[in-house]
Each structure stands twice: as C-alpha cells, then as structure tokens.
Amino acid sequence: MLKVIPWLLVTSSLVAIPTYIHATTEVVVNLNVKHSVEGKSEFERKNHIKLHSTLNDNDWQGEEDKLKYMMEELDVYFGRDNGGTVWNFNQAIEDPANIGYADPQNIIARGQAQRETNWGQNKSALHQYDGRGDLMIGGQPRAHYLGNTSPCCGGSAWQAKGGDAVGDFLGQYVNEFFRSAGDPVTKGHLAPVYFEVLNEPLYQVTDAPHELGLEQPIPPIDIFTFHNDVADAFRQHNTHIKIGGFTVAFPIFEQREFARWEERMKLFIDTSGSHMDVYSTHFYDLEDDNRFKGSRLEATLDMIDQYSLLALGETKPHVISEYGGRNRPMENAPWSALRDWWFLKTASPMLMQFLSRPDSVLTSIPFVPIKALWGTAADGTPYNWRLLRQQKEAPNETGENWVFTEMVKFYQLWSDVKGTRVDTFSTNSDFLIDSYVQNDKAYVLISNLTEQAEKIVVHKYGAPASSQPTTRIKHLYLKGAAPRLMKQVMRQISKKSRLLLKRLW
C-alpha cells in the first residue's frame, strides 16, 4: 500500500470554496491504486517538462542565473534544436568528388571542433546539466528541402542533390557533431534521440510557398517521398536515432469532409509510414473555435493510430514537438502578459492529455524558446513565444536586462509533480483529472475544459485513516490582463474537499 499524507492540487483553474456550496461534479482519487498503461505508470518529467531549447543555445549566455533556476529549482529539461542543422548545413563544403553532396572530411573536421572546443572547452560551465532530457533535432524546408546552401563569410554556395544528399549530410552530422555513447562529457554534447525530417513542411511549401520564394505550391507527395529519401540516406550512417515526420503544423483532418486527411496524413502514412519510427505533430489552440484540447486532440491521435494499424499493421509512437495556445490578432504587437496567457491556458490541459497516453506519446515539448532573437520581425517586434523578454518591453518598466515572461508560470505550476500514477475518475467528461504519488506525497491535477465555472467535490481514498494532511494548492488563472499563479495552504483537509474550477476562457 502506498503511504500518502500530504497532497498537492495543481491546476490552471482551481480555488477552494466553503463546504456548504453544492457541487455538480464529483472527482475520485484512489491514492493506493496504481494506474498503468501498457506497463507505463511513472511521470517522466524529462520527457514532458521541457524547453524548446538546448544547452548549446547561445541565448543562455549572460543568463546563467536563469538557467540554474530552471534546472535546479523548477526541474526543467531540454529540448529541441532546429537551428544547428541549418547553420551547419549552410557552412558545409561540397564534395568535389561527389557533386551535390557534402564533403565528409569537412564534416569530420568541423564536427570535432564543435565537440571538443566549442562544447568541451568553451561551454564547460554547462556540463553540469548535461543529459537533462532527450534532444530532438530536425530539418527545415528552406535549407534542406530547397537544398541551396547559404554560407557565411564568403563561402561558396552549392545545390544539394535531393533528399539523398540531405539525409547523407544529416546522418554524418549527428555522428560527428555529437559525442559517442560512453565518451566523457568533454567530448561533445550528448547525441539526439529524435530526428524530424522537416519542420512543418506543408505549411511552408504547400500552403504558403510565397514565404520561401516559390511561385507554385509543392504537392504533398513530393514532400513525403523526400522524407523517404532522407530517412534512407540518414540510416546509412545512423540507425539508433528515431526518425519522425511529417511534423504536422495544423492537423485539421476534418476539413472539407476529411479531404485534408486523405490528401495529407493518410497519404503520408501510405507513402512514408514504413520509413518512420515515430509520427510528429504540433497542436495549437487558436483564439477562435479552432481548438484542439479535449476530445478533438484525442480524436486526432486516434485517427493516426487507427489508420497506421490498418495500413501498416502497427501503430507508431508520437512525438509532440510543439504545442500551446495562440491569439493571432495579438501576434504582430509588442509583448504583453495577456498574450502569454493565451499560451498558458492551453498548455496544461494539453499536457495532461499527452500524459494520459504514456505508452504512445514519447515526448511533448511546449513551444517556449528562450530569447528567440532569430524570430525578431523586420520592424523590431520581438518573437511572440519566449521564456525571456527585456525589461523595457513591459509597460512602466525600463532597462535592457532580460527577465522572465509569464510563460515561466507553466514551469512553476508543474515544478513539484512527480511519482507513480494512481487511479482517478470524474463524473464529468469535461474535466481532466490525474494524480501521482511520490513517497508520502500525492499530486492531484484537475483541469476544467468547459467555458463556465464548475463546482466539484474531490473524494480521496487510500490515505491512512489517522493522517491529517496539509494541502497546497497552485492556482494559475487570469486576473485582469495578466496571468497569476496563486499558492495556498490548507491544513487538515477532509477526505471530501469542495472546490470551484473557474473557466479558462
């Protein structure tokens, strides 16, 4: 039996209310009944409480105190890097003996310099955080699909010879720019675990080809056969990294009576499913009715699983390499706390849904880069999604120093959660409920998916009869025009607790 005394309620819409208020929904937490899915029952923080960044990210320079806070106090992990593959592909030299392909000797030399000098010596202060999370890397349509290199410093550009040449480079890149298993940390950054062939390719080359200077859209089938060529060439050099695609930007499968499904995800599974180790998808709630959290997200993953089983005879795991919330009318404006809230109010419910599939969702990464200077607009407007902003960006603040945006509250909300998953259920299907037990502590997670406040009763069973636990509540909600993370302590809480879940909208 699990011994449970203290417990923590974590949600983005939870407050305590007096016990005389009648509740419309009941939630049950069985603290001594383990909940296992295909043998998976542990909360894997390193796979889900992640930043869209790596230790190699130059944004950490000068912000070592913030890196330490994220790693040591909030227990956050890495991460995803789609920039290193672009920069190093652009600097690669063409092989004079094999036109259209990168020179292997140049890859080896530059990789050694990156591993042993840039990482091993220049970034030795970061080695203490080595191995925090499974790294994901990937290609980009402009650099890798178009394949025309753009070197700095007077280098000569050359045209890659299709997916085979790109996969050949990327397979060697992983082998040479990262250390081998068993090597000391001074020999390079830990090698990635996942490789996405292209990031959101159909958005960039099919839906908005003008953004890449293309006159006509590229049909999806061309992108999918490119995936196959890259994967096959990559595996000539490396077979232990999981390859994924097609990194769907907007999985709106039901559009035009599911014609979009037929033309895209179904076609991808038919064409490239056998070449992939994982399926890669992005999920974002928008400011209108185009939202995924809740049943739509479940249906989207179910459709992929079911058709994969029908077409290939097997399902494949998922990697969710970006997720969160957006308010597009606010995206061309300066930073605001309210815009960050649109991200925050979606992130936790989506994470809870990913956690409910521990056997199939291998990792999920909220889209939170660090400074994201690479995304600054031509008019100087900073990138929307960032962990850090400059002081001068907020009203009534001045200064050039970098401080946390409101997005840090996602990590503060989840900072304590860990342990073994236990049984929970609710009488209301519009509530997400989950719970984990670690030693003598229980962590209870509740999220309200409805558009109105909901009263609930939480019943907990399985704690020792003599225990008089202390309950800490973390409550992330919108107050005025800014997110607020409230922390509250309740002592000697009864086995039946009456609460109010506010609406998220």
Curated annotation (Swiss-Prot):
It is found in: Secreted. Keywords: Glycosidase, Hydrolase, Secreted, Signal. One of its GO terms (molecular function) is beta-agarase activity. GO terms for cellular component: extracellular region. It comes from the Bacteria. Transmembrane segments: none annotated. Disruption phenotype: Disruption of the gene results in loss of agarase activity. The keyword RNA-binding does not apply. Belongs to the glycosyl hydrolase 86 family. This is Beta-agarase. The gene is agrA.
